[in-house]
């Protein structure tokens, strides 16, 4: 039987109240949306580059967002000394390049594991806590807003990629 990407449980969060549960809920929703868009596709479909003008693929987006989570929440916000997921010496787009369809199940699991590790890394931080990012003070709140924007942008790309792969829209 051919492996296909699993369908995630829908994420839900509060509609009012303090910033943290709202932003955590919205980030969770964006995270689940990416996996929803990928759900049911085989590794070959996830690794496909269906738009001739772009190196984007669904598998590349999964890998990219795992890298983004690690950088922003674990390395920058929490100060964890974790290794980068991809070697920048090989090029800045290693998350999108040299994709192996057989690695799709592992990439999706790695993304989910990165979510858990990232959430745990910042659980003890306050939303007003700041970290220096290239000479600018970023609050954890701003990092969450940045990540939500990053996911929203790439989920739009993912919608187009999914439609180009198999015609499915609106996931």
Regions found by a protein language model. Name each.
Residues 1-12, 20-39, 43-93, 133-171:
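Short, contiguous alpha-helical
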